[in-house]
């Protein structure tokens, strides 16, 4: 765009400043005009409103005063001797003479007509009523309309001369001697064409004219016909007249006895002085506008003469420097701001030139390849590093035709097209030969669109190789972890299977042996098996924690169940060992808590088992407390497990929760254990979003503190569980199908079931189980997992899907993996029991079976 085009498109600074000043002055003038007009108009309106209110009040006062004087005269006349004598002797001459003298004494406050009545009807009238078209009949009608009180009454009466609007009042005439009411004395004020009343209101209120209305009808007025307005225009302007009209109208509604009537009075006053004030105000505002306009023109001329030359010099310098040619120093300006702008431009141009050289050096000497492409995909420029990687020695067309560059351009082209549409691309891997480069593409966005694309590359060949090695190592680690998990699962199955036989036989022997020495030997066998099972469970739990497969399942449960379990398990153990065991509970027994009951029990079992193991004598105390904190959605279950055992050295407290760690090697040899119990406890507490800490003193004991967030549920009445004897659990013998390939396990389960008077049929694989189920009906199926020919999971699925049987299936497996349990449940099993199966555990499962599935025949 040329300078001439720029000049046509843009305005000069002098013109812009002039227009801004003109605009500012104009806005100020308009603001002053609006403000002045608003306040002046408001003041005039307030003054007009005040005048109207004063006039209205004066008119109302004059009208009421006129009625008050008439009322005073009326009441005074009714007590006069002449009127009383008329009722007694009928001397109307004296009566008429009396009223004539009264009218002459005060002609202004004289009623239009008078009349007297008795109980028998009209007695006398002054004859003036006929001038208003009111005859004797109408007088009777008036007297009948005004029967009560001595107040003024407004009425509209159809007379012989048309509709008449009048005010009527009566006053009783009383015989002062006897107190007898002789009759009624009536007076009437006719409002129609009542010129004396109108003139009195006009002169008293200092008004130019008075118009009396009944509703919208004019009944009397003082207009002569020479006024610049007529009755119709006055009626149109009476409610909302302009404050600047030539006349001011005050509308006064008339009240009779504090009651609104249809009568109202318009008072018209000249308003020329207000209109004159308005015209003078407008003239003053117009003069102000003209003066402001002249001042703006003078300022414009001064700015153009003072600023234009200096500004033109500055513009010439900027145009010269902007051409890209070598520029000269700025010559300066008399105006401080222009001089500052000129020297700033001078410094800016120098800095831009320096930056251009720096950017060019950065581009040329960068170790990473850099290129500039056009939006159409043509190479504009590349730095030496890019030329080196692409095998280009000189920027000639022959060098750009080599296969390496053409292959690179072919792979980069799709990304160039995306960047040409405005997208910024990062992390694009495009190789050059054997090397892999990661490229970033950034479009150069200017006012008219995209002028080019900057492409920057980084050699990531080493990084890619390292990533490949990392992925390989990760896959090997995952395979190793999977192999270890599979090994643990197999070892768990291989250990649990014979362990089920050992513990099962031990439990059977415990019931049948009576000799104390033999019973002691059986206890050793049971304890050894239990210890081996605990070590195995700890190893499997630790493996699950390492693999992140330990799941938390929160639900509502009765806290009493946990207390009862701890009491039943550890009190006999402690009693046998000679250790005092106490539980201090501050939580209501019927309280419902919401957390993972299984993991909470596991935490307590580990901590209390450790306390029992490492406390040869003394006491073990467990305390529970539920705390609620303000502005917290959860309660805190505070647990404290204390013992008076061997204690822990202070230097070993920091590592006590690490895996395979005990206080010292002597403890391991003397007390045994895997060293995983506290590690599992700490991980479980953290999974429950809680905290655990320990205080201990060597040879004095240890105390573990736990804080676990829980949700408190509704309290329920605690029911004492019943524990029937095995032979009484079922009313009749159950038919049980036992699917087990191991003879020892089958023997033990059959022995356990015989205590419950069950009829057990034993098959050794899934195929035999299906054949047996086709021929016979069973109440319960006990299903092993790893079976010959057809496994337990597959057999369970066949029972549900092929045979369509709903017989409860309780899986009995030595595989403690969660995945195995889920596979069994998905196939259709109702429960999963992990071997080795203890007698009490089987009893609990049979209680569950009775409560949920068994129907007594």
Curated annotation (Swiss-Prot):
Transmembrane annotation, as ranges: 20-40, 283-303
Residues recorded with modification Phosphohistidine: 493
Gene3D superfamilies: 1.10.287.130, 3.40.50.2300, Histidine kinase-like ATPase, C-terminal domain (3.30.565.10), LuxQ periplasmic domain, C-terminal subdomain (2.20.20.100), LuxQ periplasmic domain, N-terminal subdomain (3.30.450.220), PAS domain (3.30.450.20)
Modified residues (4-aspartylphosphate): 784
GO MF annotations in UniProt: ATP binding; histidine phosphotransfer kinase activity; phosphoprotein phosphatase activity; phosphorelay sensor kinase activity
Subcellular location: Cell inner membrane
Reaction catalysed by this enzyme: ATP + protein L-histidine = ADP + protein N-phospho-L-histidine
Domain Histidine kinase as annotated: residue spans: 490-712
Any one Gene Ontology cellular component term annotated for this protein: plasma membrane
Domain Response regulatory: residue ranges: 735-850
Keyword check for Transmembrane helix: yes
Pfam families to which the protein is assigned, alphabetical: HATPase_c, HisKA, LuxQ-periplasm, Response_reg
UniProt xrefs under InterPro entries: AI-2_sensor_kinase/phosphatase, CheY-like_superfamily, HATPase_C_sf, His_kinase_dom, HisK_dim/P_dom, HisK_dim/P_sf, LuxQ-periplasm_dom, LuxQ-periplasm_N
Purpose of the protein: At low cell density, in absence of autoinducer has a kinase activity, and autophosphorylates on a histidine residue. The phosphoryl group is then transferred to an aspartate residue in the response regulator domain. The phosphoryl group is transferred to LuxU, and ultimately to LuxO. At high cell density, in the presence of autoinducer, the kinase activity is inactivated, and the response regulator domain has a phosphatase activity.
Quaternary organization: Binds the complex formed by the autoinducer and LuxP.
Protein name: Autoinducer 2 sensor kinase/phosphatase LuxQ
